[in-house]
Amino acid sequence: MKKRIILLLAVIIAAAAAGVAFYVAKDKGHEKAADVSVNTESGDELLVSITDTDLLTKYYENDKVIHEEKLTSYPAFALDQKQQVLYYTGNNEQNEMRLFKLDLKSHKKTMLYKGAESADSLFLSKDRSTIYFRLGKADESNFRIAAFDLKTKKYKNLYPAANDQDDTVSSFFYNQKNDSFALLHYSVEEDYKKTDEANEKGIDPEPTTIHFAEGRQNKFNELKSLNQFISDIAVSDDDKRILFTSYTQKGTEQTASIQMLNADTKKYESIISNQKSFKLLIDAQPQFSKDGKNIYFLAEAKGAKKLKDETGREAKVRTIYSYSLENKTFKKVWENPNGIINSFFVIN
């Protein structure tokens, strides 16, 4: 049950398999995109990654294109808004992961790291000295949280312990305000066992037990365990409220809902489900607004436009919505009809 990521019908896999070459980036000089519709809550700014039908990935700061590049792997990225620096990953022809630093003012691009590892879910530390990311190694079946030192250009393992080959991190979130983490983790052995049993019986697999934890660097405290399919996690600035996307699966039919867990009481409730106007994605990526009064998330709008990429695969356009916790109302926040949103962040 390793983290499921749905792109333009898995164009990432197609690109990697085809050995897509690395292209020199075209800098758009903070070009505004006419097709982008933005309607964020007051004071909020979004960082959005989107891939179009030509497999060109663009990075937006609200409605401004701050960078674009040919897709070579799943786009993982983080923005230092104060210094106007974009950190992002991309693979080369040998399928090696590379971490780049792009100065958005001078347009200077620097490769910080190259290796056989995989990296996703990039977060910039509070003091801007470190990139936290989810690490995957070819010789391990589990995923980890690691910290990349921007000065030494080396990374170190944070969680789980280096000798632990069973515990795997399916998703994590870094709270820059409190310099803290929230994460989802589970047992690889349990997951394989349940998958094998389901295959033998020809039935849908039972969800692997997902454990919630939070803390700082090397000290994480367990919060709760649930037997549900859960794909992502995010926290409020005060670390008291935790958002996650849970979904059920019956055959090929998947139904998602966004839940909120109280870190103190350990109780949780469903707060967002499918509506007449949209269908939630199973990786809805819910996140709090800066004031904590709204929740941003990904969904497919009713009648969403279908796109076909250069490989012939089809997918529907995704939309970022917001939900008011006070008024219980929804609104469209960010949409581009010419590409598929990979992921987004509320900029701190």
UniProtKB/Swiss-Prot annotation:
One Pfam family this sequence matches: PD40
Signal peptide from the UniProt entry: 1-26
UniProt keywords, alphabetically: Signal
Domain of life: Bacteria
Name of this protein: Uncharacterized protein YdjN
